[in-house]
């Protein structure tokens, strides 16, 4: 299972990368966490979202937009949800919006939208936060004694 964290920017402060790497380095095969900066996939969703012919997503891929307000899950619920998705999909793509969120026409391409909180977070800080959230779900899925 590959977890892809997409963001339409690059060149973040070193502590952002350090926070992400702290969790990404802990994943073990067959699980993997990847940061996709200046995401071409996200740019294409924006680019083709106004076309009459819908953008075709690859088989085995599932798109999750991080967007507020949306469905909120606690850690165990998210872990169970991701475990179920891993039975059907080989790659999960999490999309972090810009400072203004996701364009409305792009939201229709997401298979679902999730919110981490009713609080608003800066899009850069979402990188290490999502790395921790996905890592926590991963550890619960594999029965690792990480905090619940």
Predicted regions and their residues:
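Short, aromatic/basic amphipathic alpha-helical patches
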Residues: 16-25, 48-52, 106-108
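Rossmann-fold NAD(P)-binding glycine/threonine-rich loop
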Residues: 97
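N-terminal beta1-alpha1 ligand-phosphate binding loop
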Residues: 1-27
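Structured adenosyl-cofactor binding patch, chiefly the S-adenosyl-L-methionine
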Residues: 105-148
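Short glycine-/acidic-enriched loop or helix-start segments at secondary-structure transitions
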Residues: 15, 74-76, 103-106
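S-adenosyl-L-methionine/SAH cofactor-binding core of RNA-modifying enzymes
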Residues: 28-93
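Short histidine/acidic/glycine/proline-rich micro-motifs that form metal-
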Residues: 9-13, 40-41, 69, 120
